[in-house]
Amino acid sequence: MAGTGHTPEEALALLKRGAEEIVPEEELLAKLKEGRPLTVKLGADPTRPDLHLGHAVVLRKMRQFQELGHKVVLIIGDFTGMIGDPSGRSKTRPPLTLEETRENAKTYVAQAGKILRQEPHLFELRYNSEWLEGLTFKEVVRLTSLMTVAQMLEREDFKKRYEAGIPISLHELLYPFAQAYDSVAIRADVEMGGTDQRFNLLVGREVQRAYGQSPQVCFLMPLLVGLDGREKMSKSLDNYIGLTEPPEAMFKKLMRVPDPLLPSYFRLLTDLEEEEIEALLKAGPVPAHRVLARLLTAAYALPQIPPRIDRAFYESLGYAWEAFGRDKEAGPEEVRRAEARYDEVAKGGIPEEIPEVTIPASELKEGRIWVARLFTLAGLTPSNAEARRLIQNRGLRLDGEVLTDPMLQVDLSRPRILQRGKDRFVRVRLSD
């Protein structure tokens, strides 16, 4: 391609890596052969303001399009956010106000900027209220006439809800048309999304055809599984790693990635070659986790991640690739500090910086407090009953010692260190 040093075929090969599906692939190649900057669209309804590594999968692929000279258009769904995308939902999503979506969007755009380049020829930010708010009812009828109710009910999430007798609001059926009209408004060549967006993106192709435009290519990326090893990464499921996590927190969470997920995390979140990934996995989960944690913690500690999170980037940090071993003098200071603290805790130590909670004197009886109540007040357990269960299973510690007595009364005349599992600590003290 002009100015990038890649032929269209080479560019396609780069873009295909990690993609789940490109619909249709031959149309993407044809568009690349036109030799012009393509308009690559991503729609985002900022129902939650914080981004995580699951979002990074799609955003990094868009960054790759930018590095090849194409323009990314990030469409903030301030209007569609008031409808609520039903994709992957088992029930109607509560709508947000226009003000709520725009407030969330500020954080969303700032965090996406850690990944996307924002030069004017490579990036454009739009709000879909620009064109959707002014649509006439006549235009809405025209849009909805392009599909049948039967076609809408073929969509997996609607189908499941319909068969289960769970209500589907009519406004939810309008969402795919609104998203499709976004593609018409900006004349999208490519629309990005996760696999759960397949239906919506295909509707975009049909609507563009109806408006006399060349249909967009649907570029679908896999959904990143979260730290629980079961569901897609989601803040609501508390199985996420945020893009703006402090280095220590990010490193710690990456070391907790379930072993079976390591291959997908390397393939979707880094640019390591396949043979390099295989070598890491063969070396074992511990060195593989360390390389993953070092790479991503270092990359996201930067104001903007590097174009490629690869072996060259790893070695530029001062780490030796071949050994995969620990070099205490290597790496940026924040990564070295995060790794050192992780190792300290893994060996049974207590981190230097831990959250602190004050306990009101009214909770004490004769200067003491029930241990289960103490852990609940500290936020380490959701209930006294759960605290008792964990103590019976030797899952809680007080000042480094394993607790065995669920009825223990704890003296709070001095600060105490509470611990749940290997890496959750709280210092508690009596309020003044």
From Swiss-Prot:
Q: Which HAMAP family match?
A: Tyr_tRNA_synth_type2 (MF_02007)
What assembly does the database describe for this protein? Homodimer.
Cross-referenced CDD domains, in alphabetical order?
S4, TyrRS_core
Q: What NCBIfam families does its record include? A: tyrS (TIGR00234)
Q: Which residues bind ATP?
A: 235
Which catalytic reaction applies to this protein?
A: tRNA(Tyr) + L-tyrosine + ATP = L-tyrosyl-tRNA(Tyr) + AMP + diphosphate + H(+)
Q: From the record, which residues define motif 'HIGH' region? A: 46-55
Q: Which family does it belong to?
A: Belongs to the class-I aminoacyl-tRNA synthetase family. TyrS type 2 subfamily.
**One GO BP annotation of this record:** tyrosyl-tRNA aminoacylation
Q: Which cell locations does it reside in?
A: Cytoplasm
For the motif 'KMSKS' region, give the residue ranges: 232-236
Top enzyme class, one word, equals ligase
- Database matches in InterPro entries: aa-tRNA-synth_Ic (IPR002305), Rossmann-like_a/b/a_fold (IPR014729), S4_RNA-bd_sf (IPR036986), Tyr-tRNA-ligase (IPR002307), Tyr-tRNA-ligase_bac-type (IPR024088), Tyr-tRNA-ligase_bac_2 (IPR024108)
* Protein name in the entry: Tyrosine--tRNA ligase
Q: Which ranges carry the S4 RNA-binding domain?
A: 369-430
GO terms for MF: ATP binding; RNA binding; tyrosine-tRNA ligase activity
Query: Other remarks on record?
Result: Although this protein is a class I aminoacyl-tRNA synthetase, it displays a class II mode of tRNA recognition.
Please tell me the species this chain comes from. Thermus thermophilus (strain ATCC BAA-163 / DSM 7039 / HB27)
Q: What is its EC number?
A: 6.1.1.1
Q: Which UniProt keywords apply?
A: Aminoacyl-tRNA synthetase, ATP-binding, Cytoplasm, Ligase, Nucleotide-binding, Protein biosynthesis, RNA-binding
- Function of the molecule: Catalyzes the attachment of tyrosine to tRNA(Tyr) in a two-step reaction: tyrosine is first activated by ATP to form Tyr-AMP and then transferred to the acceptor end of tRNA(Tyr).
Mention any one GO cellular component term assigned to this protein in its UniProt record.
cytosol
Gene3D superfamilies, sorted = HUPs (3.40.50.620), RNA-binding S4 domain (3.10.290.10), Tyrosyl-Transfer RNA Synthetase (1.10.240.10)
